[in-house]
Amino acid sequence: MPGLFSANNLIKSRKAKRLADTAYRKRALGTKYKHSVLGRAPQAKAIVLEKIGVEAKQPNSAIRKAVRCQLIATGKKITAFVPYDGSVTYIESNDEVTVEGFGKKGRSVGDIPGIRFKVCKVQNVSLHAIFTGKKEKPSR
């Protein structure tokens, strides 16, 4: 049991030990936003460079469709997953796409290795709306 006048010492030791916690350190120092490709933004616009197929991790066997694109704001190149079956056909090279995060805490999802973003819009039209046939992709 700590002594009567040991509150200050307890506070000091708590602060020191708290810095060992990685989750706390990320929150306190704000490194989540410093090292994020999107910065503080939830979404970003990008130009498609090429379409690629990413092999799924074991035990699954599939080629997940993705696009390599360059962010307009920062100029950084990222890989973004294209959701919905066959919707990669709606995306061509040099199209403008909107990308957003694709997992918890900025990490990749499931059996798709190293892909932290997904495509949500093509030429400012929702990819889901194009996929379901509700809207058409505008021509340039």
From Swiss-Prot:
Keywords: Hydroxylation, Ribonucleoprotein, Ribosomal protein. Gene3D superfamilies: Nucleic acid-binding proteins. One of its GO terms (cellular component) is small ribosomal subunit. It comes from the Eukaryota. The modification Hydroxyproline is found at residue 59. Transmembrane segments: none annotated. It holds the Pfam family Ribosom_S12_S23. GO terms for molecular function: structural constituent of ribosome. GO terms for biological process: translation. Belongs to the universal ribosomal protein uS12 family. PANTHER family: 30S RIBOSOMAL PROTEIN S12 FAMILY MEMBER (PTHR11652). This is Small ribosomal subunit protein uS12.
